[in-house]
Amino acid sequence: MSQYAAELCKLLITDNFGELYALIFIYLLNHGRQPLPRIVQNTHLSPRQVRHGLAVLVQQHLVFHCTSLDDGITYYESNWRSAYNLVRSGKIIQLVEERLGNRAASIVSTLLALGHAKISYLESLPELQPGHERPVKANGINGVHGGEGEDVNGVDNDAENHTDHAHDYQQDGPVREPNGYHDSDPGLQVQTILQQLAAFGFITRVRNQHFQSPEDNFDAALKAAKSNGDSYGLKGNKLEAKLTEDAEKLVKEWTDGRISRALPSASLLRGVKRRLRKDDSSAPRKRLKLDGPLEDDVKDEDDGDDFSDDDYHNDEMAALDPNMVIRVNYEKFNVALRNRRLIELADQNGSAVTSQVYETLLSHIEVQTPTCREHVEAIPEGEEAEQYSVSIRLDTISRDLDIDLDLAGVIAGIIPDNINGIKEDEDDEDEEGGPVSMKRRGPSRNYLVDQHLSFLAAEPSFFCTRRMQAGMITWAVEYRHLAKKLRHLELERLIEARFGGFAVRIVRVLAAKGKLDEKRLQEISLMASKDLRQILGQMASAGFVELQEVPRDAQRQPSRTMYLWFYDPDRVRFMVIEDTYKSMSRCLQRIRVEREKLKFLLEKTERSDVKGNEDRYLSAAELQTLKEWRDTEKLLLGEVARLDELVAVLRDY
């Protein structure tokens, strides 16, 4: 754990929960696994305060705990990744609001504040009931108020779950809704919204193994694998490989928090997208089939329908257990945010229509992709194996696209009048009500969709891959290649901003050719020797390129030594991540300093009689100062959100 990452986690926990919890967390982060008496001794806190703080940190999944079977002592360990995820709370709330509406965002905001909660408790909260609208604050950083941590988690704690007040980063009111968007059904019950969130995978069931560190879970699984007898007769490396494989399967099974595999994820996805496209509460609801092994196998009962009126209805779903304990699934949100980034990249490389086709493909893949990577720790570049997503049938993608989308208008050689390959004056049914045969004047809709995806699959992008399965055209995505492409684009953007376009050329040459001496590098990059040396010196001093000395003989004389330049993308990536942690910490520290300068004014604006009536109770000078402060805070928080995007690309995707 680096210095700046620890500093950032401490600032985030302090701003969200208070200094008591940050003190306990940073002690565990610096000293590793510790029992309760040692925490009390070294933090100079009372046992009651430590138990109180650990109870809240455990409920927020910021601290792991494990009781040893040998001595019965409970050890606590910090979870720094969960602490860092606090910075993405605003993005998570905004994403849920865009897809499922304000009430779903309110539920997710409540879960983020509580850490985890029973479904029955969420259903009992007045602010989450139909007809009660509260502003959902999301700024890309936090957007969550820490409240009173009540006994709602179903886990026995030694102390009452009470949290300090948490400062909300957002000061500008609720987030604006997207154009043309309205909540599809403001009367939906909490149970229905939770089913929608579960279908997207945005919430997950809390299991006992989620409170233990991955190392403890693996050790327990390894002991179970040794005792089951499946490895009888194996020795040496084969025995070790077999035990490791069985242990990983057990850990995956123990930590699988999917609420239900029978939820109609594909049908729900189509229903939500259509509700976002048009607010039609009177549309007939059709019974949706449950998912099979592949989500693209889900079809309507009447194959002739185009799903345009499909909607989600709670009666078709199994009700969630009221005693189930749930929490926010950060890993699934990372998948959704990665897909959003890929859609933006596809939009830059193609047309808006092509990016919409790609968005539809990724939306079907997303519901079946639980995590961005199988292993949390980053694998060195060049050692990662290919990771293909599930394959989605071409006709499924075509059926889910907007029927009014002009697929032919941006493809050369296709007559724009034949949009989707169907005559404009043709009806779906004849006068007797029976289906008629389509007289196509142009390419079919499936062909046009296939052309858009083929454009994305071509070099050098490789956004998707075409496959044939059982005689059907399917499309998949190779995520590891795209994640590598995103990382390289971000690093090249940083290098160009700091050293210019010629530096990007040098980096690309070194990445493609490996180690090169200055003369050979000059020949390939087509640069003057003076300019090349100047740029190499600047990049070497900043740590972006390195120089290796290879002596020609044992004397090691400078005249008999080769100097080879090389570029290590993994080292540069980790260096940039550390610098980003430092920049984020400095932004949050600056916010605290500026807030301290205006302490009395901000305390005045937080009064219940002043909040919302600033024009009445504040003077003109105070209003101007408050406006300047909010602009400054918005600027700094926006910078933190932008830096978090960089960390996500370089570390998580």
Curated annotation (Swiss-Prot):
Keywords for the protein's UniProt record, in alphabetical order:
DNA-directed RNA polymerase, Nucleus, Transcription, Zinc
Biased composition of type Acidic residues is found at 293-309, 424-433
Chain segments carrying region Leucine-zipper: 580-601
Domain of life assignment: Eukaryota
Q: Could you tell me where the Basic and acidic residues compositional bias lies?
A: 159-170
Q: What is its main location?
A: nucleus
Q: Which Gene3D superfamilies match?
A: Winged helix-like DNA-binding domain superfamily/Winged helix DNA-binding domain (1.10.10.10)
Q: Where in the cell is it found?
A: Nucleus
According to the UniProt entry, its GO molecular function terms are:
single-stranded DNA binding
Any GO CC annotation of this UniProt entry: RNA polymerase III complex
Instruction: Please tell me whether the keyword Transcription is annotated for this protein.
Output: yes
InterPro entries xref list: POLR3C_WHD, RNA_pol_III_RPC82-rel_HTH, RNA_pol_III_Rpc82_C, RPC3, WH-like_DNA-bd_sf
Q: Where is this region: Disordered?
A: 141-186, 280-309, 422-442
Pfam families of this UniProt entry?
A: HTH_9 (PF08221), POLR3C_WHD (PF22536), RNA_pol_Rpc82 (PF05645)
Q: Which GO terms describe its biological process?
A: DNA-templated transcription
What family is this protein classified in? Belongs to the RNA polymerase beta chain family.
Which proteins does it associate with, and in what oligomeric form?
Component of the RNA polymerase III (Pol III) complex consisting of 17 subunits.
Q: What this chain does, per the record?
A: DNA-dependent RNA polymerase catalyzes the transcription of DNA into RNA using the four ribonucleoside triphosphates as substrates. Specific core component of RNA polymerase III which synthesizes small RNAs, such as 5S rRNA and tRNAs.
| Protein's UniProt name | DNA-directed RNA polymerase III subunit RPC-3
UniProt source species: Coccidioides immitis (strain RS)
